[in-house]
């Protein structure tokens, strides 16, 4: 599970770097793997800080704590820059604008990276506190975690138990990788170590098609291992050193298989973000790849030396060499160093990197157990050790059974541009550049820690082997343990063990027994053959230490001399000379010193073969050291040659690529310059053409301007001559205009005089023509009036008949209703009798049954009763038929009554309209009736004589009140009387006047009816005007006319109100209302119509009068109506003469002339209420005629022409 999370951390970090270089302005391109990921993922959304946090939570508290410290170290410069933004910027301000922009572009990806790390750190700190409490609670049960390097209880138990925090982990791999995580966790922590070691080589990813087959192959391998383990259950867990590891438990084979297979997988592998599981998790899908977990229990501690050797081989081949020892019996974390097995692209990208071990490296604990997380500080734990703290102690106090942890694997040189990330401070205060990124060093540090544990386990296994061989010894010696371990290990594993333990524990090598001498010599030969793995300095140091140990072990006796190209020989001296001084053995790669102390014993005696043993050994040692130096320098030279060749090749390739790039850029620049030159030439040609066009346009405008100036001078000269001509003609025109005005005034005066004469002549002719037309119109109107009278009489008779018939029908209806009531009563009586008879029959039948009458009598009675019932039924049916007939008749009569009632209502409404119209006309006539009173003075006595009432009180010159006397009203007749016009009354009209008024009213009614039914036809006569009506009255009722001869003398009303004849030469009489009514009732007038209650007033002398109404219909005096005037009278006073048509007598003196003059004024044809026509000024305005219509007001239609157009 740790491996899965660390893999996700590494890949996510690379992805973030690529995204930062792609998204931020001026960012670098990142590493090759990041570029490949960016190309594969395209525009896919990148991971957030939560993804990194989820990946780290699955690692455990220890790794999270180390990662937190690393993030703090990475973010420290960013915080310092934020807190002090102005420090260190003077030089930057002095640089140019381009340099500042370039720096800002380079800082953009770093700012994005720091922001992501800060976000992840905050989230991890909050979650670590929560997981700390959960871990303590789980530790209380004692079954939630697995021990460090100890037996895991088997795969099945591990799977059932699960990793700590696995239930809450939501890493970038999701649930699809859960089976593989269970396999790795159940196999033990060493499985995780191998898995991480394999992931170290994730540089060249295989094609995606290999990911699923690899997972299937792993599943088959595990199943096969499970079957083999079950089949070989009796085989011992640890095989002999010479046998293969086929008999190992499934967990061991899983280790080997993972170390081999996963070392060749990349980001596109089963667990990579670009592989099937990663893509499926990103898309929310599940990959149908399941890994079956074997059910065989496996114990990591039961691994044999061969299995441990395979594990170490895998780790060494993955890039680990020359770690620094940290003391005997304690596992340390060596500094990662690239081995020659790595390809060139796996070498450090930063030139001049210090690949040697560092003094600040400390072991990294694998399982922190339940200890609290250390507080992040500015110094790692190893730095605290160098500051004086004791190893294994934290600032808060010591912790038992705990190892110091150190996040010194922080990326010094992250796979990005140089200088983007801060450097990890070293013990000496300077920076140390690393060759691996943060995720790589995370994986390598933990894997190397597990490698140390594997070595310790191998040493323990060697001790067990030595104890089993030497049964007499109580405890295995160190040389026996080492010999057993080296004998069981391979070359590479032995080399690792020797390099890890021997340089720091040479004192333990000095105690090798004689049994280990041959093993040490063989190891020396193996080390000399494995020089390609380690550097020459370490090899020579190890060889010198072995030689010294061999000489010390042999003493004065013969010893074993180990040289580079020598065979094993027996040395004459038994031990080193006595004067051998202490020598310092320096391990160049790890820069650690180890002292070889010469034993304090006497020198060996002299020998003939070796007269000077001490000098010989001293020279021999000096020669060996020189040979070691030669070998070391040769190795360094070869290494430098290789490096130089690689650098040369790299620089040559870079130079070639740069040259090719520069050639391409030069070609592009040349092409762009040629295109720019062609474009500029085209622009220049177009500009020249444009300028030539502008010049031509300016020349054309200049030519036009010159022509315009020439024309302007000619036009100005011509304009001056035209102005002079205009002034002369203006003066002539004014003179002519004055002459024309004078001639016009003279002509206008002449025209006025001529037109005035013509107008007078035309007026006289029109007046004569009008008189002739009025005479004809009057006769036609009289005929129409008679026809209207006949029609009215007929309608009256028909109305009376309808009323009588209606009364009869109403009486019949009442009779039928009475008969209907009687029929209903009869029906009820018959029904009541029928019920009574039925009851009687029932009673009789019951009595007959009781008394036992005979059947014949009963039948007779019943027959009689049935006959009676039949008669009653027939009578009832007849009554019902009669009732239905009467009801039908009543309905018909009711319908006829309703129709007749509607007709009567229509006639009544028509009569009401006629009556209202006539009443209005009578009210108007009442206003127009005047009474002429003549006052005579004889012998100082005065008397008043009233003339008959006249129509038109305003014609006499007086007002309607009759108070003023018009000028000229008095005359010098015989008697010397004055005539006064007073308002008259309708009852003073004579029968002749009433008849004429009634005729005029009928004419008006006929005309109004015609207007209400539509426009007049050509055959319908126009209504009578005042003048026409006066002419008709003068012709029909004047003196000598038939109407006048039929009139009798009527009594006159004197001034004192008495009735009787009126004396005087005029013989005039004024009839009273009672006399007029009596005359109308006596039937003395032929012109009385059959209108029932209507009486006709008559007049004489051509006087226009107004009509009266019947007594039953008259609304009384003062009712408003239509004002109307009558017209002409015959000149002369014959009809008012002394012969007297009415009152008798003869003569017609001056009084008659005065009356004629007054009547002529009243009944004048032209402007009766104003001035005469001759007195009116001439106007050109044409007045339209006025037409009297029903509903118009009477006051604005008062005139002498009535409804005729003037």
UniProtKB/Swiss-Prot annotation:
| Name this polypeptide is given | Cilia- and flagella-associated protein 157
Q: Which InterPro entries match?
A: CFAP157 (IPR038844)
> Is the keyword Lipid biosynthesis assigned to this protein?
no
Compositionally skewed regions (Gly residues) per UniProt: 1037-1046, 1058-1067
Claim: Coiled coil is one of the keywords in the record: yes
Species, as recorded: Chlamydomonas reinhardtii
| Keyword annotations | Cell projection, Cilium, Coiled coil, Flagellum
Q: Where is the composition biased (Low complexity)?
A: 88-109, 156-173, 385-397, 951-973, 1014-1035
Q: Ranges of Polar residues compositional bias?
A: 1175-1184, 1193-1206
Query: Coiled-coil region(s) at which residues?
Result: 634-732, 799-833, 876-903
Listed GO CC annotations:
motile cilium
């Amino acid at each position: 599970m740790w491996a899965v999370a660390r893999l996700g951390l590494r890949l996510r970090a690379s992805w973030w770097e690529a995204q930062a270089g792609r998204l931020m302005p001026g960012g670098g391109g990142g590493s090759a793997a990041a570029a490949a990921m960016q190309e594969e993922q395209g525009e896919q959304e990148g991971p957030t800080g939560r993804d990194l946090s989820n990946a780290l939570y699955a690692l455990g508290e220890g790794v999270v704590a180390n990662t937190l410290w690393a993030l703090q170290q990475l973010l420290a410069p960013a915080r310092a820059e934020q807190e002090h933004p102005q420090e260190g910027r003077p030089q930057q301000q002095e640089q140019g604008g381009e340099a500042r922009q370039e720096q800002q572009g380079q800082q953009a990806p770093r700012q994005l990276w720091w922001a992501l790390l800060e976000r992840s750190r905050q989230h991890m700190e909050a979650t670590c506190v929560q997981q700390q409490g959960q871990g303590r609670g789980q530790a209380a049960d004692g079954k939630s975690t697995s021990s460090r390097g100890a037996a895991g209880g088997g795969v099945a138990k591990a799977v059932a138990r699960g990793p700590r925090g696995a239930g809450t982990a939501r890493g970038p791999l999701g649930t699809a990788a859960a089976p593989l995580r269970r396999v790795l966790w159940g196999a033990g922590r060493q499985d995780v170590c191998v898995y991480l070691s394999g992931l170290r080589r994730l540089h060249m990813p295989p094609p995606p098609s290999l990911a699923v087959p690899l997972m299937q192959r792993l599943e088959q391998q595990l199943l096969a291992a499970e079957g083999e383990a079950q089949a070989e259950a009796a085989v011992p867990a640890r095989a002999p050193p010479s046998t293969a590891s086929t008999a190992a438990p499934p967990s061991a084979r899983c280790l080997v298989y993972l170390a081999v297979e996963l070392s060749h997988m990349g980001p596109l592998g089963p667990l990579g973000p670009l592989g099937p599981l990663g893509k499926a998790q990103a898309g929310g899908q599940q990959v149908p790849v399941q890994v079956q977990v074997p059910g065989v229990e496996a114990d990591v501690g039961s691994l044999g030396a061969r299995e441990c050797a395979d594990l170490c081989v895998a780790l060494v081949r993955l890039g680990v060499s020359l770690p620094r020892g940290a003391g005997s019996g304690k596992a340390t974390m060596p500094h990662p160093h690239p081995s020659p097995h790595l390809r060139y692209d796996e070498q450090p990208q930063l030139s001049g990197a210090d690949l040697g071990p560092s003094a600040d490296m400390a072991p990294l604990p694998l399982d922190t157990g339940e200890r609290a997380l250390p507080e992040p500080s500015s110094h790692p734990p190893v730095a605290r050790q160098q500051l004086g703290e004791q190893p294994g102690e934290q600032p808060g106090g010591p912790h038992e059974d705990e190892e110091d942890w150190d996040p010194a694997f922080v990326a010094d040189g992250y796979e990005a541009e140089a200088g983007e990330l801060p450097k990890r401070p070293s013990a000496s205060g300077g920076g140390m550049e690393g060759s691996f990124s943060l995720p790589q060093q995370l994986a390598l540090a933990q894997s190397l820690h597990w490698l140390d544990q594997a070595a310790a386990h191998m040493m323990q296994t060697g001790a067990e082997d030595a104890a089993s061989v030497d049964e007499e010894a109580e405890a295995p010696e160190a040389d026996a343990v080492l010999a057993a371990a080296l004998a069981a290990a391979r070359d590479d594993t032995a080399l690792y063990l020797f390099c890890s333990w021997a340089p720091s524990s040479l004192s333990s090598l000095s105690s090798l027994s004689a049994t280990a001498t041959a093993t040490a010599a063989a190891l020396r030969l193996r080390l000399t053959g494995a020089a390609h793995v380690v550097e020459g300095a370490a090899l020579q140091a190890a060889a010198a230490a072995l030689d010294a140990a061999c000489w010390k072990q042999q003493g004065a006796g013969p010893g074993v001399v180990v040289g580079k190209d020598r065979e094993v020989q027996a040395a004459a001296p038994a031990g080193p000379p006595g004067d051998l001084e202490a020598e310092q053995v320096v391990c160049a790669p790890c820069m650690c010193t180890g002292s070889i102390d010469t034993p304090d014993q006497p020198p060996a005696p002299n020998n003939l073969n070796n007269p000077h043993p001490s000098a010989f050994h001293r020279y021999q040692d000096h020669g060996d050291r020189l040979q070691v130096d030669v070998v070391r320098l040769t190795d360094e030279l070869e290494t430098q040659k290789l490096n130089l060749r690689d650098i040369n090749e790299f620089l040559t390739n870079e130079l070639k690529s740069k040259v090719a790039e520069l050639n391409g850029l030069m070609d592009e620049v040349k092409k762009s310059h040629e295109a720019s030159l062609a474009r500029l030439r085209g622009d220049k040609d177009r500009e020249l053409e444009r300028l030539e066009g502008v010049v031509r346009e300016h020349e054309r405008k200049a030519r036009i301007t010159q022509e315009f100036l020439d024309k302007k001078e000619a036009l100005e000269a011509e304009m001056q001559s035209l102005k002079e001509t205009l002034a002369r003609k203006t003066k002539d025109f004014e003179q002519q205009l004055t002459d024309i005005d004078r001639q016009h005034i003279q002509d206008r005066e002449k025209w006025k005089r001529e037109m005035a004469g013509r107008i007078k002549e035309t007026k006289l002719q029109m007046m004569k023509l009008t008189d002739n037309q009025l005479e004809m119109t009057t006769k036609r109107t009289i005929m129409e009036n008679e026809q209207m009278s006949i029609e009215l009489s007929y309608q009256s008779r028909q109305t009376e008949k309808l009323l009588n018939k209606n009364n009869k029908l109403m009486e019949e209806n009442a009779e039928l209703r009475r008969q209907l009531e009687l029929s209903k009563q009869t029906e009820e009586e018959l029904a009541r009798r029928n019920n009574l008879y039925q009851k009687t029959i029932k009673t009789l039948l019951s009595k007959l049954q009781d008394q036992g009458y005979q059947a014949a009598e009963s039948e007779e009675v019943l027959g009689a009763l049935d006959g009676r019932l039949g008669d009653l039924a027939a009578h009832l049916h007849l009554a019902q038929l009669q009732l239905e007939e009467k009801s039908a008749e009543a309905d018909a009569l009711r319908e006829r009554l309703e129709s007749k009632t509607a007709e009567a209502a229509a006639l009544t409404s028509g009569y009401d309209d006629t009556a209202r119209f006539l009443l209005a006309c009578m009210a108007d006539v009442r206003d127009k009736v005047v009474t002429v009173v003549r006052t005579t003075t004889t012998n100082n006595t005065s008397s008043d004589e009233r003339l008959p009432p006249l129509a038109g009180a305003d014609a006499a010159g007086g007002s309607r009140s009759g108070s003023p006397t018009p000028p000229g009203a008095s005359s010098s007749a015989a008697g010397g009387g004055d005539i006064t016009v007073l308002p008259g009354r309708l009852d003073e009209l004579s029968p002749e006047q009433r008849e004429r008024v009634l005729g005029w009213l009928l004419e008006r009614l006929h005309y109004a009816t015609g207007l209400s039914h539509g426009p007049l036809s050509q055959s319908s006569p126009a209504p009578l005007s005042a003048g026409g009506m006066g002419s008709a009255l003068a012709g029909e009722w004047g003196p000598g006319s038939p109407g006048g001869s039929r009139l009798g003398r009527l009594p006159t009303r004197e001034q004192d109100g008495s009735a009787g004849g009126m004396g005087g030469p005029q013989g005039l009489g004024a009839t009273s209302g009672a006399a007029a009514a009596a005359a109308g009732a006596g039937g003395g007038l032929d012109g009385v119509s059959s209108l029932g209650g209507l009486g006709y007033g008559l007049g004489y002398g051509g006087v226009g009068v107004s009509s009266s109404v019947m007594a039953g219909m008259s609304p009384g005096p003062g009712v408003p109506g239509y004002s109307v005037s009558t017209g002409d009278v015959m000149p002369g006073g014959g009809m008012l003469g002394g012969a007297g048509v009415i009152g008798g007598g003869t003569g017609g003196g001056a009084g008659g002339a005065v009356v004629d003059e007054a009547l002529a004024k009243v009944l004048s044809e032209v402007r009766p209420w104003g001035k005469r026509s001759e007195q009116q000024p001439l106007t050109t305005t044409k007045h339209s005629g006025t037409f009297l219509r029903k509903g118009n007001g009477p006051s604005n239609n008062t005139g002498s022409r009535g409804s005729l157009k003037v």
